[in-house]
Design a protein with these regions (language model features):
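Non-catalytic alpha-helical scaffolds
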Residues: 95-96, 100-117, 121, 171-188
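Membrane-engaging insertion elements
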Residues: 8, 29-72, 151-216
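Membrane-inserting effector segments that mediate pore formation, membrane fusion
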Residues: 114-180
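Acidic, carboxylate-rich catalytic segments that either coordinate divalent cations
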Residues: 210, 215-238
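Terminal export/targeting leaders at protein ends
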Residues: 1-112
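Long, helix-rich, hydrophobic modules that act as membrane-proximal anchors or helical bundle/coiled-coil regulators
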Residues: 1-17, 110-125, 180-181, 201-204, ...
Length: 238
């Protein structure tokens, strides 16, 4: 009986050990794949810089240099101020309120309250409503999971995934290329928000909140109805 129990225990221990090994290997594999993909993006971006050697492609060269400069500027703001992510969400909501009269805030608030969102109506203005909604969005678990997950992934790829100076450079360039791709996509699909971020030197760190913004349908701020805006805000706060 003792040996039988010992064998069963040993088999169970080996099974658990194998499962742990598989989990660890899967984690390592994902980190390696992410790092290689990031370095691949870095190599691609570095190859774009060959355009600087050709007279006919100086516009491409100029765009790359501008993206690098603005990425660093955005990153500096992120490091300097803890509320930059909040500001980006606030700017997003502001683009939808720019053509809304002050009395619309009360109507939109009623829609939000009807959906289970509590915001005080005392002295309510568009500005106060924007601040309140932006705060609630930034406090949702989904928002924090997405945004801080992206921040940690970016930091991990640049630091933990880099063992040589070349790897560091390629990972950083890969990160900038990801940021540039996200900014270009935003410019194409939501030029109002892109222009607002650009004016604040924040479009190159938009990639950190991109999944949150693209998780809701795009609606033209110039023609969005009050009901559509309320529904958009409700989706962002869930």
């Amino acid at each position: 009986m003792y040996y039988r129990n010992f064998i069963i225990t040993s088999i169970e221990a080996e099974r658990i050990l194998a499962m742990k090994f598989d989990e660890a290997f899967a984690g390592v594999k994902k980190n390696v794949i992410d790092t290689l993909n990031q370095m691949g993006n870095g190599i691609t971006r570095a190859s774009y810089y060959t355009s600087c050697l050709m007279d006919n492609y100086q516009d491409v060269c100029s765009k790359l240099k501008q993206e690098d400069t603005r990425f660093i500027a955005g990153l500096a703001q992120l490091v300097k101020s803890r509320d930059i992510i909040f500001q980006m969400i606030k700017i997003y909501i502001e683009t939808y309120f720019q053509n809304k009269k002050e009395e619309k805030a009360q109507y939109i608030l009623k829609k939000l309250v009807g959906a289970g969102v509590y915001i005080s109506s005392s002295g309510l203005t568009n500005r106060i409503l924007i601040m309140a909604v932006a705060t609630m969005i930034c406090q949702t678990s989904r928002f924090n999971t997405v945004v801080y997950g992206r921040i940690n992934r970016a930091r991990s790829l640049v630091l933990k995934g880099s063992v040589t100076a070349t790897a560091v450079v390629l990972n950083v360039y890969g990160l900038i290329q990801d940021a540039a791709n996200s900014a270009d996509n935003l410019k194409m699909h939501n030029s109002f928000y892109y222009n607002a971020l650009y004016a604040n030197h924040l479009e190159m760190i938009y990639f950190l909140i991109e999944p949150v913004i693209t998780g809701v349908p795009y609606l033209n701020p110039m023609i969005i109805s009050d009901d559509e805006l309320a529904e958009l805000l409700i989706k962002l706060m869930r």
